[in-house]
From Swiss-Prot:
Residues 24-305 are cytoplasmic. The chain crosses the membrane at residues 3-23. This is Protein QmcA. GO terms for molecular function: identical protein binding. Keywords: Cell inner membrane, Cell membrane, Membrane, Transmembrane, Transmembrane helix. Disruption phenotype: No visible phenotype. It is found in: Cell inner membrane. GO terms for cellular component: plasma membrane. Belongs to the band 7/mec-2 family. It comes from Escherichia coli (strain K12). CDD domains: SPFH_paraslipin. Residues 1-2 are periplasmic. Identified as a multi-copy suppressor of an FtsH/HtpX protease double disruption mutant. May play a role in the quality control of integral membrane proteins. Forms oligomers. Probably interacts weakly with FtsH.
Amino acid sequence: MLIFIPILIFVALVIVGAGVKIVPQGYQWTVERFGRYTKTLQPGLSLVVPFMDRIGRKINMMEQVLDIPSQEVISKDNANVTIDAVCFIQVIDAPRAAYEVSNLELAIINLTMTNIRTVLGSMELDEMLSQRDSINSRLLRIVDEATNPWGIKVTRIEIRDVRPPAELISSMNAQMKAERTKRAYILEAEGIRQAEILKAEGEKQSQILKAEGERQSAFLQAEARERSAEAEARATKMVSEAIASGDIQAVNYFVAQKYTEALQQIGSSSNSKVVMMPLEASSLMGSIAGIAELVKDSANKRTQP
């Protein structure tokens, strides 16, 4: 009897070991009994029926990255374009992912490639290059809906690269260079135009200010002439009144002042060869005496009845 005890202990340990399962974090295991799915083991320690239950599939529940192989797509405008993409998936239902499709990753890759050809084949090359976000969103919606029966959640689909043919790339580069040159010429012409406009505006303002200054100067000159004329008229009036009243001194002062001004104007002449000599004193006195006689005659006429 004692010899069978170690054997029984060993058998018990084997049975316990066959019935105890430890599932790592991030995984779920399916359990099959006689080839039929019965339950799903969650992460941690779990028990199964020894020799009757077995582990069917070990499903990775973490988000996974599937590299979509490069493929050529013919665009709507008949351009052969090489497309490179990547797909992010996560299993949300382990039993369906294990038993609804035979090769999950291969099925998702083929499904994604097919939809890439469908979506991008309906677009022109310019749209492929400029609307990548829209393409990603459209692919995500289509592929995620198609993988729902498999218990898969497609989180992202990214178009990593869109490569046109080499000759088309050269043509596009030449077109871009021509476009940049065109924009440079346009900017240069616009700068010259703005400079000419500013120059014209400056000249316009200068002419306005110049005209305003000339107008102000003319106004001041006219005002000065008007004042001079008024002063001349007042002086003439005063002389007339002095002659009428017989004031010889006022007449003499007026005549002497005009004589002096005339000499100053003649002396300031640019012709240095002209030498002006003042009138003789006797002639000047004779002129004054003649004016005095006129004043006396005028006074006598006023006193006569």
